[in-house]
Amino acid sequence: MKDLVKFLKAQSKSNDDFDVIKIGLASPDKIRSWSFGEVKKPETINYRTFKPERDGLFCARIFGPVKDYECLCGKYKRLRHRGVICEKCGVEVTQTKVRRDRMGHIELACPVAHIWFLKSLPSRIGLILDMPLRDIERVLYFESYVVTEPGMTDLEKNQLLTEEQFLDAEERWGDEFEAKMGAEGIQALLRDMDLEHQCEMMREELQETNSETKRKKITKRLKLLEAFQQSGNKPEWMVMTVLPVLPPDLRPLVPLDGGRFATSDLNDLYRRVINRNNRLKRLLDLVAPDIIVRNEKRMLQESVDALLDNGRRGRAITGSNKRPLKSLADMIKGKQGRFRQNLLGKRVDYSGRSVITVGPYLHLHQCGLPKKMALELFRPFIYSKLESRGIASTIKAAKKMVEREEPIVWDILAEVIREHPILLNRAPTLHRLGIQAFEPILIEGKAIQLHPLVCAAFNADFDGDQMAVHVPLTLEAQLEARALMMSTNNVLSPASGDPIIVPSQDVVLGLYYMTREKVNAKGEGMYFLDPREAEKAYRTGQAELHARVKVRITEHVKNEAGELVAETKLLDTTIGRAILWMIAPKGMPFKVFNQTLGKKAISKLINESYRRLGLKESVILADQIMYTGFAYAARSGASVGIDDMVIPAQKHEIIRAAEAEVAEIQEQFNSGLVTAGERYNKVIDIWAAANERVAKAMMENLSTEEVINREGNPEKQASFNSIFMMADSGARGSAAQIRQLAGMRGLMARPDGSIIETPITANFREGLNVLQYFISTHGARKGLADTALKTANSGYLTRRLVDVAQDLVITEDDCGTHEGIVMTPLIEGGDVKEALRDRVLGRVVAEDVLKPGTEEVLIPRNTLIDEKWCDVIDAESVDVIKVRSVVTCNTDFGVCAKCYGRDLARGHLINQGEAVGVIAAQSIGEPGTQLTMRTFHIGGAASAAAKESSIQVKNAGTIKLTNAKFVTNKEGKIVLTSRNTELTVIDTFGRTKENYKVPYGAVLSKNDGAEVAVGEVVANWDPHTMPVISEVSGRIQFSDIVDGLTVTRQTDELTGLSSIVVQDVGERATAGKDLRPALRLVDAQGNDILIPSTDVAAQYFLPGKAIVTLDDGAEIEVGEALARIPQESVGTKDITGGLPRVADLFEARKPKEPAILAEISGIVSFGKETKGKRRLVITPAEGEAFEEMIPKWRQLNVFEGEMVQRGDVISDGAETPHDILRLRGVHAVTDYIVNEVQEVYRLQGVKINDKHIEVIVRQMLRKAVITNAYDSEFLEGEQVEVSRVKIANRKRAEEGKPLVEFERELLGITKASLATESFISAASFQETTRVLTEAAVAGKRDELRGLKENVIVGRLIPAGTGFAYHQNRAKKRNQQEQAVAFEAPVEKLTGSQPMLISKRNSNSLQTMQLKA
């Protein structure tokens, strides 16, 4: 018996104590050592006895017994014969489960190339032999010979010979040389490789070569050769002579009812290989003719290819049902593959799912669980209780009792469930709040009851949603569920730090109704002793809920010592607000409750409560608010009736006026005063404005009503119209929706996104006519199609983000860096988009913040800025703070807590072990489904942005112009001639108040440094056309303006004026293609006039569609328009918005026509032009001049002789993040990506903290390219993890060697995920085959640092509660290593076990051999 216990213990304790996994190529000997015997026959099982055939694919002698402890012939049965090998059938008596891990092998009659190393690009075999893939394939598939040993002939090694050439050579030289065909030839070449010699040659070549492409090629090959050298892999192992056979239980053969069998496709593929192999052996024994043998060898190669990766080469082999067979490669890749289906997405026991419904009477930490479900989920617990109480004698009896549902069982269930948390999950789980823990309350019925306040976190509604229930079993699991996942511990959103437990819909409406004021309501002016008395008056009908009254209120306020002190005052309020005050916790001020509470105000209230009083009080408050809200929503009786949609009286007048304006524009168009594009734009502007006016009239009408007050005078008050109240409170609906119900529907879009110029003037209350209805259907259908696309795209974005950031964990408290990023308030136009306090809240200060204008330290370095500090920042009006950021954090693998700052979901400095990468990915991905797919929101956003034509300042101050170049026209006004000018308004302290972009050709009334008053208009321009401004006075001379070739002349019939329109290059005849229409300015003598302070002639090239109204030879003054270019339809070009834009930014994609940035700082000049390009030269103060060719059609922002700084914009366009990183550095690129991503989310009203985006940027920047390697282990031009270079440089600094030089590189998230150090993580993401091939050849080691790798090998993740476990292991390992270092360093390699993965304990290394 003792033996048995020992044996079972030994069985369960497999050696999973490893810290590294290594992957490599398997040598033939290795494969034979795993194997338990050779598979010689293609047979599987005997059709009569169903026993496995001997030496077949399911042979019991090779793979182990079919029944536990029983040999095949039945001679030995039972446990006592354990380990005996039966002499009759040769089967070892042991457990059946060995059939899951015992492998076999096939001895191949001729070598076969492994398709992964051949066809997975770049071909590893091709790279190492330095032969093109086509040639290698010709050799492998027996079309050509390859010379393996040239001997004394004039053939070369690796040369290909056709059949004829081979025969000729044989006649000529006899057996002086050797040439082979098929995999043997390739194997021979690989075996003869002298890796060291090759490496040396490559290094020499690298020194000598100058061409960039050659360098790249050599570096690639050198890296591969070095990888082979270091990993101990041999190149000839890429060609197999032995094929491993998978254990039979991993490719099962299952009998179905009806005598048929279901089999794994692998068995078919193996059968093919064995059949062909056996046939080839026979042919070789018979010495068959060459051509037959060759054909058989080729077929063998093809069948092995199909087994390893079906469909990689040629047509995929199909089964009986015409569908391709699933090969070994297909088993592991893709969504259904081993990685994603079984290792990362396992099914869970003790779980159930059901429909959810509302539980308005629950507490926040509770959920209603149907009794039936609970009984099933908690079965084992009930059995054990029944048994331990002696109610049931055995487990079987207990089971019977539970099945009969005896009354005692329910009592025990209630006891078991008490304080045992359960997890609820709603798919899709887009962020961590999609799984939360609750205490179950047993209920009748079959639906799970959910607390209404957590619906926002789960994104749940009750229209048939289902949720899954999971039971945490172990004590640790229950503890984590209670301490970390309980719904009461997740009040704040991890994305923004705002409360996510906020009331919505009914509750908001109830509270809003309850806290509204009404003029002259019953009971107005009464006085009450306390809120209870006020409530009594309301309940007895003495006073209305909305009556303005005076109530004595007792507030509890904190004094200096931080104790709560009661203060009682008589305050003006309403009865409803006084009643609501009764649920307020001590320590909250009354002013928060004494207002009309909309959704935003309630959110603020809960936030305030959380910051002031902590978690417990806030949770109780949230619950109370919910109960009160529901009660008063029911009392309010708010409902929607058709008469609530009041149509404004002015509507018809507004529409008539708009129609008249449109008719006028149409007249102008007919008489040729405006172009078609301008007409279209103006029409759309007119209708957009009309729509706004109707909406405004309607909202004024709806939102206020006139009533008679107590004095008998009329007074305006907010309306009690139900529709208005719902929208105003934020319960449901919005102004935009009310506009469609009671205003006019407005402009609609065609399916391609362009705007139809006839708007829908009707609204839903009036009803649409057929045409209007038809136009509406476009939008509705597009909306549905978009939603479907959006969900998939958003999910994929989230997956890529999680993958790139998954291994980022807080690993230390402080990395000690002084670096950081500079934060200023975000100002766009006249509004502050985001105040400084909101941007720095929860960050750690990187440098002391000084009081403005003094040397006094206001906030010391390394302070975490909380709400109190924010008030200080506001009070002292600080406008720039340097904060620490994850992008500049110095921690090697991970981030430090100080650089990350506050844990947004908890409100304190983040803890070590927090998986910030995953949280960041979820926070960015989760709102993804709310972002539009459409290029932009139709009508609203597009036309409003395009209509601006002047700048009116909102604050007094001083004007500052940046990047401005201008001329002064004859009226003395300033006309801008620069393209990206910014106009800033600065107050007396030098703080930026407003910030505007001013277009080219704008007329400014104020110069740089001038004072402005509030409301002054400082700039104006024509929004529909862009002028070409003359910078000198003179006479116009046409150049290359040829009627009918480059321009067309248009004459206006009414006015007789003629204008010239330049044709697009694409539309011109061939003769006009190379002509460049331009206007030159000349003096009286006909000489070119130079642009002031340069030696460049004033000539202006005209782009296509430009319109010139001046004649040749006309006189012109400075600052006048020479021509105008119509701005095409309202900014529909290239506004990628919403989700695609975010994806583009994170993928770091290069835009189509990127901005051209200055590569160095210096003076601009123009060199010799070529046909289609001009030469731009930048000459620095010292050093080499830099030149580049720029296409002539690009508009330049710089003039001859101008000074530019490195990274300045030379030609407009979308900026490329790669350029920004190269020219302006890491901070600039971080700013760019963070601001651009935030721009998209802000437009949708989604709040995400900057630091989440910074976390992703850090991961995008984690690679560097080596620019100067010196004598380090790196190669020049190699891509390496930044942390590895930093570690190497620290070591070099200690040794006094020069530091390795490198440049940071920006990778898109997909690329960055695939370029991660961990091959397991990369393989489970995308392109599994390629990643594994690359890793195997290089003999990569996976240090198991990230989360994914650890989930895949089945361990606790190194984050959260698993963080400490991993740290302790590392500590132990270090202690052991130090102890070992004192002993003699003898290390013996144990023989590897017969498993796919061989593991080694001596230095805790695990090797995964990848052959099949």
Curated annotation (Swiss-Prot):
One Pfam family this sequence matches: RNA_pol_Rpb1_5
Q: Can the keyword Transcription be found in this entry's annotation?
A: yes
The cross-references to Gene3D superfamilies, in alphabetical order and at most eight, read: 1.10.132.30, 1.10.150.390, 1.10.1790.20, 1.10.40.90, 2.40.40.20, 2.40.50.100, RNA polymerase II, clamp domain, RNA polymerase Rpb1, domain 3
GO CC list? DNA-directed RNA polymerase complex
Q: Name one GO biological process term.
A: DNA-templated transcription
- Catalysed conversion reaction: RNA(n) + a ribonucleoside 5'-triphosphate = RNA(n+1) + diphosphate
Which HAMAP family has this protein been placed in? RNApol_bact_RpoC
Q: Which family does it belong to?
A: Belongs to the RNA polymerase beta' chain family.
Function summary: DNA-dependent RNA polymerase catalyzes the transcription of DNA into RNA using the four ribonucleoside triphosphates as substrates.
The record's section on PANTHER family has: DNA-DIRECTED RNA POLYMERASE, DNA-DIRECTED RNA POLYMERASE SUBUNIT BETA
What name does UniProt use for this protein? DNA-directed RNA polymerase subunit beta'
User: To which species is this protein native?
Assistant: Actinobacillus pleuropneumoniae serotype 5b (strain L20)
